[in-house]
Amino acid sequence: MSSSIAAVETAGINLVILVGEVTSPVVSRTLASGDTASSFDIATVTETGRVSVPVAVAGECDIATVGAELCVVGYVRRRFFRSGTGVTSRTEVVAESVVPMRRRAQARKIATRALENLSEFLET
């Protein structure tokens, strides 16, 4: 899945760039609207260890297979939903672009575009 990065809003910036390994199978579900949403976990390695990050994608995401190394560009969102115990929340990265790292030029392109948008925002 690859899509364009939305233009930077002047009210603030919410930008995530992840490069890591998919650690859970993709879970796809059909929403009430009829649209498909998919989710998976990706692990990154930091100075303090491995961090697992939940990722949500609009539509199907066939490239997110367990063990695949991906570049994800998106934003952080906290969403609320009803569960058996009441209202629950989940914080996740909403992916705007997902590219396998075996396509390094394409991964570099989406990351560079996101960083250029950030740079433009910081210059204003």
Residue ranges of model-derived segments:
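Single-stranded nucleic acid-binding surfaces, predominantly the OB-fold ssDNA-binding core
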Residues: 1-124
